[in-house]
Amino acid sequence: STELTGERVLADGQKLQHSATADIDVHRPNMLRAKMVSPRAVREIFYDGKMATISIPAQKAYSTVEFTGNLGELINKLEERYGVEMPMADMFLWGTPAAPLDKIESAMNAGQDFIDNDLCDHYAFRQGNVDWQIWITTGAKPLPRKLVITNRSDEARPQSVQYFDWNLKPTFKDSIFKFTPPKGATAVELRSLDKK
């Protein structure tokens, strides 16, 4: 799960902060269930290796598209073709050949910090118009605990901050990755960004 805080910059430069949470269940290489919750919306994404479904429970609406591929490919398709953003999207690419390591302009070890009670190595990176920092637990099971992204293309330098909590021994069944429409829900077309 993750807690996310982001900033929106108004025309006069004033920053507004917003928050959301996401619970994500993953069975690699090709199953995912994500629930994103903010005060403004609840959105769910299901992927069982054959079908990807986006559900908006408050509107009793969902869209399903056929897809076979790994999670990184799914996330890229949803964003590029449909404009759907996934929380923690980059984490599905890290450690794979698709990770955009060639785009990193600079990197540094910024020392160590505690995130909750976990001692973490702190790294800072510059990549295009983005600065990002990550805190990874030290020891036998290194996992990201915090991620900060700063948008350098905006003079106000808005940031997003994510804290991660990991469960490496989940007890779910594969059936949680298959979407079953709730009673009264309506299927709607997920329109491609290139359609007018």
Feature map (PLM): residue ranges:
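Acidic/charged, solvent-exposed loop-and-adjacent secondary-structure segments enriched in E/D, K/R, S/T
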Residues: 54-89
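Hydrophobic transmembrane alpha-helix bundles
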Residues: 31-46, 74-75, 185-196
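Gly/Pro-enriched, hydrophobic low-complexity segments
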Residues: 53-54, 63, 102-194
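Extended amphipathic, helix-rich lipid-handling scaffolds
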Residues: 91-93
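N-terminal mature ectodomain segment of secretory-pathway/periplasmic proteins
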Residues: 1-61
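Edge strands and adjacent loops of beta-rich recognition modules
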Residues: 97-100
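Residue-level detector of flexible, active-site-proximal loop/helix-junction positions
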Residues: 4, 69-71, 151, 170
